[in-house]
């Protein structure tokens, strides 16, 4: 039995994570096509490790949700979350993982938008930042459409396909967020 959605758009629902969610997250995490440009998933994760990771996300400094397409309520296609929430400086890191099987249908963009609305409206954060591979054109375009802008790069920070690539740092401030 799945929980009710916490946040919902016309394409995606953000569902509270359950301790048993490693069952659906592990195959997505271990899919090389899904994690091609990510830090997560570069090495396989066993189910027990996945369960421990999900348990570690249940803390006052993290808000992580499973992603379900609206038309397939019982299906999970990834996660989105705010990590390292700093309650003094009012900031957090945003991370998202969407199964490669559902790329290109707007789930990632809408989940990002819903998470930003949650961060700025409910948590009253001032800043949300992220990092992504400079060669991940799809993610860069999605984040820019949601209002993130590049703040800088960690040069030759990530090893991909036989060479080092830059890690792009992007951020958005509460005052800049327009609900994308």
Predicted regions and their residues:
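Acyl-donor (CoA/ACP) binding surface of acyl/acetyltransferases
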Residues: 1-22, 27-31, 71-180
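Sparse recognition of residues in long alpha-helices and their boundaries
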Residues: 41-42, 66, 159
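A general structural signal for well-ordered secondary-structure junctions
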Residues: 34-35, 63, 125
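A short helix-loop-beta-strand connector motif used in the catalytic cores of GNAT acetyltransferases and
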Residues: 54-66
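Conserved GNAT-fold acetyl-CoA-binding loop/helix
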Residues: 33-54
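Short helix-loop boundary/capping segments at the starts of domains
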Residues: 31-34, 59
